[in-house]
Amino acid sequence: MTEEILKVEHLDKYYGNWQALHDINFNLKKGEVLTLLGPSGSGKSTLLRTLNGLEDYQKGSIYFHDKKIDPTIKEWQLLRQKIGMVFQSYDLFPNLTVMENILLAPVKVQKRQEDEVRKQAEELLERVGMQDYENSYPRELSGGQKQRVAIVRAMAMNPKILLLDEITASLDPEMVRGVQEIIEHLSNRDHMTMIVVTHQINFAENIADEVLFLEDGRILEDTPGKDFFKNPQTARAREFLDSMDF
């Protein structure tokens, strides 16, 4: 039986009096790619940020390896070392080189040896075709190159789960496929456990083991990927897919 790595039960999230997430329930198995789909404003990114402690929640439980997470700042600081996140906006430090961006958290936060992390970073940069840019600054890179560095930076922390929030949304169309291929390799070669938010339906179809379809902060479908794209169970999901060009 495949190990369950993350479980969410009855999660509610509010901004003031407005409820952004309603009774969210799902589990994630080791090596699985879970894709969050739905229209803009459906709660996908809010859910992703909640799973990394960047947003708090008012009700429900999150379990990591069967351990219930205490929703405190200290607990999330420790957990973020195991749950990596890559953002749409890259979030690289502009005053640091590519290599310095990658080394910072593993060395300063995880207290690992710099030589060990540097070797790992060099191998990861080569895998994403960025081996010649380790001394470059973010301002010298294209959007696609910055996103590759952001992925490497997250992977250098040796995360158990990788969260990807619309990582191709800010890229030129010609850059999108290259970044998508990196994620596909992480899934197929490394069996990396991932939760992916995307509007790229072809990409989602290629990588999704499971799909959560959300609208208005609610999960309308929790369906295996191979079934969702061929035969969605709800009229709203069928309408959503019909509106997408894929």
Language-model-detected regions and their locations in the chain:
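C-terminal boundary and immediately downstream tail of ABC-type ATPase nucleotide-binding domains
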Residues: 226-246
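ABC family nucleotide-binding domain
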Residues: 3-225
